[in-house]
Amino acid sequence: MTAPLLEVSGLTKRFRMDRTIGDTLRRKPHPAVHALNGVDLSVRRGETLGIVGESGSGKSTLARCIVRLIEADEGTLRYDGVDIRTLAGSDRRAFNRRVQMVFQDPRGSLNPRMTVRQTLAEALTVHRMRLKAGIPDRIAELMELVRLPREAADRYPHEFSGGQRQRIGIARALSVEPECLIADELVSALDVSVQAQVVNLLLELQQRLGLTILFVAHDLRLVRHLSHRVAVMYLGSIVETAETEALFAAPQHPYTQALLAAAPDLDPTRRHRVPAAKGELPSPVNLPSGCTFHPRCPHAFDRCRREAPLPRPTATGTAACHLLDQAAPAAVPNRQEIPAHGL
């Protein structure tokens, strides 16, 4: 078995909060938001790993820690066997070229005063991807790659639709010829029909360019159609990881079961008959003891309140739950594209 391209081990991130006047006078320590709590994760070369979970589960923080837009407090991040948390200078720039991120809001990541041509030329120049004479041809290639007309390169971001701006963000990421693409809520702000077009474009680009993709989303339909494997996050921890179709067919963790049961489905015969998670997401400032899901879990018992479960093998992958038994892994069918007319 080949080594993973990206390996995350024990990744922890806390965001310190301001103290109240009373806490300051009492010299109490600063409270902190526990965004990531010892995350372990691996991504194989050429695969798409979907990251799902409720808002506040730590998905986007994990993505930003991987590309070092946010520095983790503890843990290791290895890319192609190298600890990327130690990289600096030219080594850091080389990593930035190999791993690119596409953001949820393209308007916030594109300079409104620069045309698409200037944006793409800047990336090509900074990373020395082409000689000056070859930049126009490369820009034309990139526009064609994301299915935008060549003449659109001389327009500004505000002249495009949301889906087109997201394609420009993808083109900018691809301009430096990365190996790994991290898509953070790539299409969550787009209409459903446009979502299908962008997701199918991503599938096509992966097959054409051999990309490894980390796909962060809360929309389970998108994750199912795009991902080879899925990791489920809850309050800063990975609670279950499995091959995509195996996870959707037989979720092992109670949180995964509740997450799938909450997803809308027009076919009544396919609706999950699983108890829903109780209450609201607990505060990440004061995490529950033991298993962090136990206050909402319909199956919780005393051990869940006392002891945090470790990931264990299941019939479909791994999951962190005291209820689980050991079973043989299940066979997983292939992915399919989303129909262009919708999801």
Where are these regions (language model features)?
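Short catalytic/signature loops enriched in Gly
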Residues: A3-P4, M17-R27, A32, E243-L343
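Conserved ABC transporter NBD signature motif
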Residues: G75-D83, F95
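Conserved ABC ATPase "signature" region
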Residues: V82-D83, G134-E151, L260-A261
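Conserved ABC ATPase signature
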Residues: Y156-F160, Q164
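A short, proline-enriched helix->beta-strand linker immediately N-terminal to the Walker B motif
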Residues: S175-E179
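P-loop NTP-binding/switch modules centered on Walker-like glycine-rich loops
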Residues: I182, L186-H272
